């Protein structure tokens, strides 16, 4: 497992599947192979790519954590993905103007194309994890609290869109453009939206977190027939529930994360193995792995 720790430490690490620490990638600093503010990463057979937003560069490590090289990029970006053809796609940090939201570069980080300009005045304001996420259908591109998700092909070109219809609970357009200002102006926040890029568990089964400003729900849905079910997170929720899904292998396995913060927020915490409780009490987080089983009549 590869994890970008977005706590104050902001480090990139990897673990074996049994939880054994494996490697740390880079460190805080200004030198080669060092980052100031790692914001996103991508992993494939060629290594680990870390996007350092503040320094406007991409650092490339091999699986063992050794530095391969780094490249400067001439823009601020929130997300990175290496494409099948060896080129890269970046989601650009919005600045209120109609700059492109997607910039494509060659393997040396030279811009070669762009698409999907932001709406005039768009500044975002809501941090989204997993802006680019792989699925069996293609590469999913999503920024919260938008009500649409773009599916890209292997070269990063838009194929189709999935629209999320929350009816009268949909986020107003003003909030989609500037979420921070929308909240600061004391507008109601009783609107539903995805917290992060939803996760494809199989071709037709997706999972994600939604919130309405007061409550959090785990939603399982089929985006192609509008069928869905949601479970509200309350003190009656079990620690073994899928509370914060973060990753799937797209074959029925979903990985979620739990932390010590859940101790007084849900039940069954004391039923965790002592080794897990001790690890959580020491400030660690734990990955919870769930497997969906599908039965045919």
Give, region by region, the residue ranges found by the protein language model.
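Short beta-strand elements that form the blades of beta-propeller/WD-repeat-like
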Residues: 1-6, 46-52, 86-94, 133-150, ...
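Structural motif
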Residues: 9-13, 55-59, 96-103, 146-151, ...
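Blade-loop segments of beta-propeller domains
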Residues: 11-15, 20-45
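Short coil/turn segments at the loop-to-beta-strand junctions that recur within blades
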Residues: 26-34, 72-78, 117-123, 164-170, ...
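Asp-box/WD-like beta-propeller blade repeats and closely related beta-sheet repeat scaffolds
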Residues: 35-39, 51-100, 112-121
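Repeated scaffold domains used in trafficking and secretory/extracellular systems
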Residues: 36-40, 75-83, 123-131, 193-197, ...
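Loop-centered beta-sheet repeat module
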Residues: 100-153
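Conserved blade-ending motifs and adjacent loop-strand segments that build the rim/top face
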Residues: 160-190, 224-251, 258
């Amino acid at each position: 497992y590869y994890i970008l720790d977005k706590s104050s430490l902001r480090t990139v690490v990897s673990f074996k599947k049994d939880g054994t620490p494996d490697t740390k990638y880079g460190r805080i600093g200004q030198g080669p192979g060092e980052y100031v503010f790692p914001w996103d990463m991508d992993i494939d057979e060629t290594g680990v790519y870390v996007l350092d937003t503040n320094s406007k560069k991409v650092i490339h490590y091999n699986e063992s954590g050794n530095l391969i090289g780094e490249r400067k990029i001439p823009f601020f970006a929130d997300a990175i993905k290496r494409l099948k053809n060896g080129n890269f796609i970046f989601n650009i940090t919005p600045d209120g103007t109609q700059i492109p939201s997607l910039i494509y570069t060659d393997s040396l980080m030279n811009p070669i194309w762009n698409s999907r300009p932001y709406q005039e005045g768009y500044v975002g304001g809501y941090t989204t994890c997993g802006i680019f996420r792989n699925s069996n259908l293609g590469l999913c591109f999503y920024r919260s609290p938008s009500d649409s998700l773009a599916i890209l092909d292997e070269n990063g070109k838009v194929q189709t869109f999935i629209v999320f219809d929350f009816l009268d609970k949909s986020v107003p357009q003003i909030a989609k453009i500037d979420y921070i200002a929308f909240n600061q102006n004391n507008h109601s926040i009783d609107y539903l939206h995805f917290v992060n890029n939803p996760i494809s568990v199989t071709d037709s089964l997706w999972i994600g977190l939604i919130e309405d400003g007061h409550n959090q729900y785990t939603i399982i849905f089929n985006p192609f027939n509008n069928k869905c079910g949601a479970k509200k997170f309350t003190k009656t929720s079990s620690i073994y529930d899928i509370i914060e899904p973060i990753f799937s292998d797209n074959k029925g396995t979903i990985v979620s994360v739990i932390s010590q913060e859940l101790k007084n927020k849900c039940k069954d915490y004391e039923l965790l193995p002592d080794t897990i409780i001790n690890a959580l009490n020491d400030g660690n987080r734990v990955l919870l792995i769930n497997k969906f089983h599908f039965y045919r009549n």
